Regions:
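Ligand-binding pockets and gating/stacking loops
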Residues: 1-118
Length: 118
C-alpha cells in the first residue's frame, strides 16, 4: 500500500485481501491427526484499500465469540456487487446465460455497500 501511495497509484488501484468464509472461534472436536478450526460461513473478514474505498472504516461486527455476524451484515453477493461497482461495472447489468436464463453474478440479493465508499 505504501508503494502504491508513493507512486500515486493507490487511488486508482483496488486492493482486496480476504475470503468468502471465516474460521470458527472454537477448535474442532473430531480430534484426529489434523485438528483445527472449521470453515465459518456466518462471519468473514475482508480488507479493502484504495480505489474508491474510504480509509479507516470498519463495517459490521460479529457476536462476542466471533461466531456469527451481529450487525451491518454483508453477504458475499454484496461484497461482489461492491467490488464490481468500484471497478466501474454495474452488477445489475452483468449477466451470464445458463440453461436459457440470464443470471446475475450477484444474484438478486447483491447490493453495493455504500458505507465504505469514499
Amino acid at each position: 500500500l505504501k508503494d502504491l501511495k508513493s507512486r500515486g497509484l493507490l487511488d486508482s488501484t483496488l486492493v482486496i485481501w480476504g475470503g468468502e468464509f471465516g474460521r470458527k472461534p472454537t477448535r474442532d472436536r473430531n480430534g484426529g491427526d489434523n485438528p483445527g478450526r472449521d470453515h465459518n460461513a456466518k462471519a468473514f473478514s475482508v480488507v479493502m484499500a484504495g480505489g474508491g474505498v474510504k480509509g479507516g472504516v470498519v463495517h459490521g461486527a460479529t457476536d462476542d465469540l466471533g461466531a456469527e455476524s451481529a450487525s451491518d451484515k454483508v453477504h458475499v453477493h454484496d461484497l461482489h456487487a461492491t467490488i464490481l461497482h468500484l471497478l466501474g461495472l454495474d452488477h445489475e447489468q452483468l449477466t451470464y446465460r445458463f440453461q436459457g436464463r440470464d443470471y446475475r453474478l450477484t444474484d438478486v440479493h447483491g447490493h453495493v455497500v455504500k458505507g465504505i465508499l469514499s
